[in-house]
């Protein structure tokens, strides 16, 4: 190879290399262009992000400012609230101590129980009257802590306690007629009068409040009254006995013969005086009933015989008025536990009323029959004046006499039915009547037999 | 009216003058010899002094410190020589407690003046003395 050829070859190689480089450069340039574009787009997105961040930052700042304000407000509010609560608490405290002071200072004993009858509050008077300290009785059953007994020292059963009845939703009961006693911690007792009321929250009984007081003083006054009545009646009876006995002796001729006219006058004196004696006796009975000094002596009593003897006793009046008298007694009426004297008074009152308030030639019926073997029923009916409908509810009231008989020539005190009702109810019986004016009346008495065998 | 061969002596303890007179008259008409006293003390003295007293008619409330009840308590005490003497209480104080106390002490009868005729009471006493075991 010659030189020229060699150079030409070398040049050609160079040219080729150049071309290769140029191509490479073109490629690189293209690549660079692409990168530049990418960079530009990245820059742009960065700008957007930066702007967004700026916005968020601004928002954040706004929010922060708001929060600062709210926090301040909250602080202020909480301070106000705190102050208010403090003031309110103070008020409440005042009210509470006021209430407490009032409850504590009540002269009557006071006890609050929950729905189970457990003591949740007692006042000072409770402590003083019963000898228990608050700490000893809180949470304990009132009925157990403070036993209650009747006049005769018989304990009132749990289920019969007013407190129990009130808590079980029974209607409010306040029995002031029968005195009862509360037993102190030291087992001594005092007569009590109490009132129990339920505590109702949202329509439900959640407990009860009982207020009670010591009625020793009242009892003493009552006793004095009884003694006074007894003494007064004694004083009344003495002159009555004098009139009674002297007119009796005059009538008997103990002071010489009396003319028939004198006899008539003496008989009037005697009868008038007899009425006075009966009146005093009736008044005595009423005062005994009212003062609870009626002594009940239960005995095995034959009620049929009792009714028969009362009828026998009133036979003259029945015959006088030509009254048709009928009686019927169921067979096998057993002996019953009753006070014959008191039972007799009931029968006497009802029968004498029937006779008294039935015009001549009327009809009176007496019957005795059993009901379920547990009760005996006495039924006394007449065809008399009857009781006006509008006075039915008053007929057992003391001293009440119906309009339609006051005008008639009948004696009466308005005490008979009052006494009868008191006796029947004391014996745990019932008394009622049916009556139509000018047709007659029927009285019913239901008495528990409390049967006794001979 | 029963005729008696020998009169019975009865001590009437009652303070109300008109009543005493009536009681005395009625009892005498029924064949009793009557001694009257106004107080428990007086009655006790008569009992000691007069030894043929067969019965006592006694009121409850009497003047002085002692009531009929005190007198009966004394009469019926275990070592009393009048333990068996029948006592009839005739009083207007029918307090249940008094009646019970009298009957517990062993009096023969208790009756309320105002509720009884005088001749009724006298007859009852006479009958009782005739048949003491009844």
Specify the residue positions occupied by each region the protein language model found:
Chain B
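Non-catalytic signal-transmission and effector/linker regions of two-component phosphorelay proteins
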Residues: 1-11, 116-134
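Conserved acidic carboxylate
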Residues: 14
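Two-component/phosphorelay signaling modules centered on CheY-like receiver
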Residues: 17-36, 40-41
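Acidic, metal-coordinating helix/loop segments flanking the phosphotransfer/catalytic sites
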Residues: 36-55, 63, 120
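His-Asp phosphorelay/catalytic-motif detector in bacterial-type signaling
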Residues: 52-54, 80-86
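Short amphipathic alpha-helix used as the core "switch/output" element in two-component signaling
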Residues: 67-83
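As written
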Residues: 102-109
